């Protein structure tokens, strides 16, 4: 077993830079000081979570914890006014919520055509869609399938049960 570091991370001193700049890399301080009544967890200066660049930026700029941010996004369901903002680099984002289809194995999530987007489950009741308004989707070059994957051999006695490839 490896030995654990023999120090406490308080997010101060030489570590203050990470705490102050983590949002630029998509991280947030998961349990910030002063949000204990909302998170139900005491302040943990060492506990960071990756949420993605746009979300980390918004959370940091608005002094929110993750629970507050998720509640805010729920107030912007698809079809209503999305949460829109511009980050410090001038990039524009649109964020909206899509509730999961209770009882179904799948949920249809409306997304924009031709613009980069990401979908993330909120681990509770739905999905957060992030639209990168300034980033059109570019067609990626097709990759060639390995030769062994180009054809499939089906036993003759089951061939009638297999739909023909189109």
Outline where the language-model segments fall.
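Ser/Thr/Gly/Pro-rich low-complexity, disordered linker/stalk segments of secreted
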Residues: 138-166
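Cell-envelope/glycan interface and biosynthesis
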Residues: 1-86, 90-137
């Amino acid at each position: 077993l490896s030995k654990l570091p023999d120090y406490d991370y308080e997010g101060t001193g030489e570590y203050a830079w990470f705490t102050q700049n983590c949002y630029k890399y998509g991280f947030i301080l998961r349990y910030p000081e002063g949000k204990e009544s909302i998170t139900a967890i005491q302040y943990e200066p060492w506990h960071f979570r990756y949420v993605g660049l746009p979300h980390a930026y918004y959370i940091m700029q608005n002094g929110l914890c993750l629970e507050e941010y998720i509640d805010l996004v729920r107030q912007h369901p698809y079809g209503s006014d999305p949460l829109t903002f511009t980050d410090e680099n001038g990039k524009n984002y649109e964020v909206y919520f899509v509730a999961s289809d209770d009882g179904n194995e799948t949920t249809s999530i409306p997304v924009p055509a031709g613009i980069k987007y990401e979908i993330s489950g909120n681990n509770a009741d739905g999905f957060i869609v992030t639209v990168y308004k300034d980033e059109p989707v570019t067609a990626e070059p097709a990759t060639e399938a390995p030769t062994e994957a180009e054809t499939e051999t089906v036993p003759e006695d089951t061939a009638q049960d297999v739909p023909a490839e189109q």
